[in-house]
Amino acid sequence: MQKIMHISVLLSPVLWGLIFGVSSNSIQIGGLFPRGADQEYSAFRVGMVQFSTSEFRLTPHIDNLEVANSFAVTNAFCSQFSRGVYAIFGFYDKKSVNTITSFCGTLHVSFITPSFPTDGTHPFVIQMRPDLKGALLSLIEYYQWDKFAYLYDSDRGLSTLQAVLDSAAEKKWQVTAINVGNINNDKKDETYRSLFQDLELKKERRVILDCERDKVNDIVDQVITIGKHVKGYHYIIANLGFTDGDLLKIQFGGANVSGFQIVDYDDSLVSKFIERWSTLEEKEYPGAHTATIKYTSALTYDAVQVMTEAFRNLRKQRIEISRRGNAGDCLANPAVPWGQGVEIERALKQVQVEGLSGNIKFDQNGKRINYTINIMELKTNGPRKIGYWSEVDKMVVTLTELPSGNDTSGLENKTVVVTTILESPYVMMKKNHEMLEGNERYEGYCVDLAAEIAKHCGFKYKLTIVGDGKYGARDADTKIWNGMVGELVYGKADIAIAPLTITLVREEVIDFSKPFMSLGISIMIKKPQKSKPGVFSFLDPLAYEIWMCIVFAYIGVSVVLFLVSRFSPYEWHTEEFEDGRETQSSESTNEFGIFNSLWFSLGAFMQQGCDISPRSLSGRIVGGVWWFFTLIIISSYTANLAAFLTVERMVSPIESAEDLSKQTEIAYGTLDSGSTKEFFRRSKIAVFDKMWTYMRSAEPSVFVRTTAEGVARVRKSKGKYAYLLESTMNEYIEQRKPCDTMKVGGNLDSKGYGIATPKGSSLGNAVNLAVLKLNEQGLLDKLKNKWWYDKGECGSGGGDSKEKTSALSLSNVAGVFYILVGGLGLAMLVALIEFCYKSRAEAKRMKVAKNPQNINPSSSQNSQNFATYKEGYNVYGIESVKI
């Protein structure tokens, strides 16, 4: 059995005597307040003071209890009745309403309540809260809803739900009713998220929240968490305190939010009360000292006024009301009703006053009549009244001119919060940032862009760095947005000026301006070491296949020239001496032996010529076509030789995304939270899908938390890691020391960076126009040149570019020297062989010459010399062939 916390705030007779003056005309009033209703109790006390009169005083007896506990309610009610109270003010819920109404009807004790109206007729129950059914149905018809979800709290009763379902059956509405009253508090957040995700699958984007403030706030928190508070969603808060909830966090999301308001803050009576209410001490009056008041507290305050007015009217009518001593036992059998309870009930129902909740008047059943409920909508500049509902006029729309979503006139006195991210060269901390304050601490492309945007739009701004250091992505499980997108979605920032990629999923929850920069996903790798030229790099201008063909062509031409010279009679001639005498021999000679043919072809190929030339037409044809061939080959070789010898080349292991996907030696990854990762995750292109499969399953993880971490990983991986990032950032890092990264291949896609604002923000259109104007003025290009190239550290053209023209080094032409040295060495070797061979032959000849039997006296020295010359000449190919 739960123990009742009985507070005898029975303001003691001495204390109340000090407040109201000592008087015997004390009217005992009971009070049943639920735990946690601090503001309602403060409003009750303020009403007691405010409406006190010199004629009589209301003396309260207060009990704090769990209104859902029927036993506790019974015990408290009987305790109040035994004290001799004239009426009881209090709260109930679905579980205790029948207990209270039963006691009131049996004992004739009036019960004044701000709780939800009950169905049917309950004597002695005075309902301070107006019925919302008519206003809600009128609003549904006004918005022309024919399909929606209805979330209700069963603790508030089911009368409103029943009215909606009855109308749905009549008008063929599709209503999905969901009870959220029995959700476990420990798992409420998860349950709410799951609930709205299920509604999303059913395309339910129109929702009625028939709940009290605390539950509405809990639901709204989860709606924001999963991004269901954006354009395309519409919520109706079905209670009388539209402004009671925390609307600021959903104000800029873009969703339509409507509701009802019973307290009109434009009313002079309410304004005067708020002036006094806001000056009360919080310690003495918990929940006070605010510029607003909950509608349940306002109804509590009005209830005190109704009770005061009722007893005043009884005194004016000279109806004596008294309860002397103990009123008796409420559980007596049979029950003994209070004889004067009927008079008090009648007096209460006859009260007609103006209160914080407007005109207060009751019908014969104790229900409010002739009341007016304001219809509210949440705009970007706050809650706004669009009309009202009354029993007579029904719904009347009074707001004919809606505020423009492009209006920025209210920004002059507001400091716009600009969220951004530390990312070079967009936003960087200045070197002396510790000595600076505010926006002066930062520099970069986006810092300059923010200043220009603010200048064109005419607002003050404050730069803030996103807390988690992320751009913005939605968690697959919790559906929570992080990064800068999350700060916009959840109302922590007014605008995001950063390298934020425009994507579909982001566009669903925030608004983007026109792109201020175009880019695409690119590949960053560590710049490979310059390839050292080989010893025979002079052969590189022509492929090895061409060199082989040249060798075969050289041999083939030489052989053909040799054969042609043998068959053509015009290549044969008789040798003559210098004195004109012919040789005595009848044999003819041919200069194009096999060795001379090879020598002629080699001389022509080297463009150096030769001592001999073809005499016949056929030989000259062979020589001509060979000269033409060598002309083209040598010209092509010379043209390429300069580039190959003077340009240093870097051999990249990969050149495209296809190269990455086909290999496993080089790991590759993206930023862990951003549009690049989303691009690969959503891509249906085979190459990119294959890359995503690898990245998702790679161990260790190939994803990095920041771009700086990704660049550092590229630099430290010794060419074993490639980082996929936006091309603009890739180009910028390539310009920064130590100049050891490079962009390879083309862009994988095409996209743009945009300035983001919350859905429906008044800043959206103004920012968009500012971006277009800056683009037309060429300022965006100037800013990029300033931060990318003018401040580059690797020189123009990308620093140590892929190809750099420089002076020739020895390594470039070392092979030529090797061939020269080799040729000289070979020549010396051949000369030595020739010398040895000739010496041996000469020795044999001399030996024969010394033999007396072979001495020919008629031989002269001249004949010996000629023979020696001819023999030596024949070594190089001059031959006598007899045909």
From Swiss-Prot:
GO terms for cellular component: AMPA glutamate receptor complex; asymmetric synapse; axon; cell surface; dendrite; dendrite cytoplasm; dendrite membrane; dendritic shaft. The chain crosses the membrane at residues 544-564, 617-637, 813-833. Belongs to the glutamate-gated ion channel (TC 1.A.10.1) family. GRIA2 subfamily. The modification Phosphotyrosine is found at residue 876. Disulfide bonds join 78-330, 739-794. Palmitoylated. Depalmitoylated upon L-glutamate stimulation. Cys-610 palmitoylation leads to Golgi retention and decreased cell surface expression. In contrast, Cys-836 palmitoylation does not affect cell surface expression but regulates stimulation-dependent endocytosis. Changing residue 504 to Y: Promotes dimerization. Strongly reduced desensitization. The gene is Gria2. The M4 transmembrane segment mediates tetramerization and is required for cell surface expression. The record marks 474, 681, 773 as: Interaction with the cone snail toxin Con-ikot-ikot. CDD domains: PBP1_iGluR_AMPA_GluR2, PBP2_iGluR_AMPA. Residues 867-877 are annotated as: Required for interaction with IQSEC1. The postsynaptic actions of L-glutamate are mediated by a variety of receptors that are named according to their selective agonists. This receptor binds AMPA (quisqualate) > L-glutamate > kainate. Ionotropic glutamate receptor that functions as a ligand-gated cation channel, gated by L-glutamate and glutamatergic agonists such as alpha-amino-3-hydroxy-5-methyl-4-isoxazolepropionic acid (AMPA), quisqualic acid, and kainic acid. L-glutamate acts as an excitatory neurotransmitter at many synapses in the central nervous system and plays an important role in fast excitatory synaptic transmission. A lipid is attached at residues 610, 836 (S-palmitoyl cysteine). This is Glutamate receptor 2. It is found in: Cell membrane; Postsynaptic cell membrane; Postsynaptic density membrane. Homotetramer or heterotetramer of pore-forming glutamate receptor subunits. Tetramers may be formed by the dimerization of dimers. May interact with MPP4. Forms a ternary complex with GRIP1 and CSPG4. Interacts with ATAD1 in an ATP-dependent manner. ATAD1-catalyzed ATP hydrolysis disrupts binding to ATAD1 and to GRIP1 and leads to AMPAR complex disassembly. Interacts with GRIP2. Interacts with GRIP1. Interacts with NSF via its C-terminus. Interacts with CACNG2, PICK1 and GRIP2. Interacts with GRIA1 and SYNDIG1. Part of a complex containing GRIA2, NSF and NAPA and/or NAPB. Residues 592-607, 608-610 dip into the membrane without crossing it. Residues 1-21 form the signal peptide. Pfam families: ANF_receptor, Lig_chan, Lig_chan-Glu_bd. Detected in forebrain. Detected in dendrites of neuronal cells. Expressed in the pyramidal cell layers of CA1 and CA3 and in the granule cell layer of the dentate gyrus. The record marks 654 as: Crucial to convey clamshell closure to channel opening. It catalyses: Ca(2+)(in) = Ca(2+)(out); Na(+)(in) = Na(+)(out). Keywords: Cell membrane, Disulfide bond, Glycoprotein, Ion channel, Ion transport, Ligand-gated ion channel, Lipoprotein, Membrane, Palmitate, Phosphoprotein, Postsynaptic cell membrane, Receptor, Signal, Synapse, Transmembrane, Transmembrane helix, Transport, Ubl conjugation. The modification Phosphoserine is found at residues 683, 717, 860, 863, 880.
